[in-house]
């Protein structure tokens, strides 16, 4: 059985983390169980000040597919993403935000691109960052450039 590590960086996501998990589990059951593919959920709490970590711990108690990392303070989404990549154990690794801005169902299309089409990597790319605070956009762009320079994997901004 193959496993997909779904890395979920979280910062004050108490209003969305349970909804995200429910939708991701539905996708796993309906679209991946028939393929004999399982999920590992790796939530990375980036120093949330709300009940995000408490909710993640509750998910962990009920589901052995859930793992988590908890930061002592807010280090930023990029640090959470990196910690997730360093601790993922699946055959495939992906990242999804808990706010469901990118639907978990797109994972099936991405998986098919790797398995059926033979790609080494597949990425979804946000075409525009419209409406996002300028500092967040600058930070995200800097992260993608850094990863591009430090790794053999090309990461396009917005991916």
Where in this protein do the model-derived segments appear?
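Acceptor/aglycone-binding surface of glycosyltransferases and processive sugar-polymer synthases
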Residues: 58, 65, 71-73, 77-87, ...
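N-proximal low-complexity "stem/linker" segments adjacent to membrane-targeting elements
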Residues: 1-37
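Residues at or immediately flanking beta-strands
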Residues: 3, 36-40, 65-68, 154
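A conserved acidic beta->alpha catalytic loop
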Residues: 42-53, 100-101
């Amino acid at each position: 059985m193959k496993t997909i590590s779904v890395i979920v960086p979280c910062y004050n996501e108490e209003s969305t983390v349970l909804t995200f998990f429910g939708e991701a589990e539905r996708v796993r059951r309906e679209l991946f169980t028939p393929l004999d593919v399982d999920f590992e959920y790796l939530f990375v709490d980036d120093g949330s000040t709300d009940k995000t970590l408490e909710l993640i711990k509750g998910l962990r108690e009920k589901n052995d597919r859930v793992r988590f990392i908890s930061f002592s303070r807010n280090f930023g989404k990029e640090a959470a993403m990196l910690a997730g990549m360093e601790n993922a154990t699946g055959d495939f690794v992906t990242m999804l935000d808990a706010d469901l801005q990118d639907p978990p169902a797109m994972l099936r299309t991405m998986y098919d691109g790797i398995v059926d089409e033979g790609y080494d990597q597949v990425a979804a790319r946000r075409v525009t960052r419209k409406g996002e605070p300028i500092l967040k956009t600058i930070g995200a762009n800097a992260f993608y450039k850094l990863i591009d320079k430090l790794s053999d994997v090309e990461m396009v901004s917005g991916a």
